[in-house]
């Protein structure tokens, strides 16, 4: 769920998801359109695509199990939905961590109306 995703982000980046990733670029936060602004925004684009594939799941509310040790997040046992949601969230948190060096504060609270490029397909 979103609280677990927030915790994963904190583990991998040392940043709070709110405000650092809730409205970053064109894809971090609710919805998304246009072309991702940078590598961090692309992490959100890929995460959105991952959630889109989970048609019979509730990724924002379903609770899953995971563990963290020495900077490695591992998804635990659960239903197929729980495992898939966890993997989507884990991959995004890892992606955020890998792209911290290029994180740009100017893309925080980026206005949607500036996301005018044609959208990419998942």
From Swiss-Prot:
Residues the record marks as active site: 47, 89
Alphabetical list of Pfam families matching this protein: Phospholip_A2_1
One cellular-component annotation, GO: extracellular region
Disulphide bridges, residue numbers: 26-115, 28-44, 43-95, 49-122, 50-88, 57-81, 75-86
Reactions the enzyme catalyzes: a 1,2-diacyl-sn-glycero-3-phosphocholine + H2O = a 1-acyl-sn-glycero-3-phosphocholine + a fatty acid + H(+)
Cofactor or coenzyme needed: Ca(2+)
Binding site for Ca(2+): 27, 29, 31, 48
EC annotation from Swiss-Prot or TrEMBL: 3.1.1.4
Cofactor binding note of this UniProt entry: Binds 1 Ca(2+) ion.
GO biological process: arachidonate secretion; lipid catabolic process; negative regulation of T cell proliferation; phospholipid metabolic process
Stored CDD domains: PLA2c (cd00125)
PROSITE patterns for this protein: PA2_ASP, PA2_HIS
UniProt keyword annotations, A-Z: Calcium, Disulfide bond, Hydrolase, Lipid degradation, Lipid metabolism, Metal-binding, Myotoxin, Secreted, Toxin
Subcellular location: Secreted
UniProt GO molecular function: calcium ion binding; calcium-dependent phospholipase A2 activity; phospholipid binding; toxin activity
Tissue: Expressed by the venom gland.
EC main group: hydrolase
Principal localisation: secreted
Gene3D superfamilies reported in the protein's UniProt record: Phospholipase A2 domain
Function description: Snake venom phospholipase A2 (PLA2) that shows myotoxic activities. PLA2 catalyzes the calcium-dependent hydrolysis of the 2-acyl groups in 3-sn-phosphoglycerides.
UniProt record similarity statement: Belongs to the phospholipase A2 family. Group II subfamily. D49 sub-subfamily.
Entry protein name: Basic phospholipase A2 Sms-N6
Protein's organism: Sistrurus miliarius streckeri (Western pigmy rattlesnake)
Source species taxonomy: Eukaryota, Metazoa, Chordata, Craniata, Vertebrata
């Amino acid at each position: 769920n979103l609280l677990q995703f927030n915790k994963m982000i904190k583990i991998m980046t040392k940043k709070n998801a709110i405000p650092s990733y809730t409205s970053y670029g064109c894809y971090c936060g609710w919805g998304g359109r246009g072309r991702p602004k940078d590598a961090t925004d692309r992490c959100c684009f890929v995460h959105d695509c991952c959630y889109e594939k989970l048609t019979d799941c509730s990724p924002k509310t379903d609770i899953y199990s995971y563990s963290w040790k020495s900077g490695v997040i591992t998804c635990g046992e659960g239903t197929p939905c729980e495992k898939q949601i966890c993997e989507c969230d884990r991959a995004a948190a890892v992606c955020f961590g890998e792209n911290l060096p290029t994180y740009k504060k100017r893309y925080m609270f980026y206005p949607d109306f500036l996301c005018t490029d044609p959208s990419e397909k998942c």
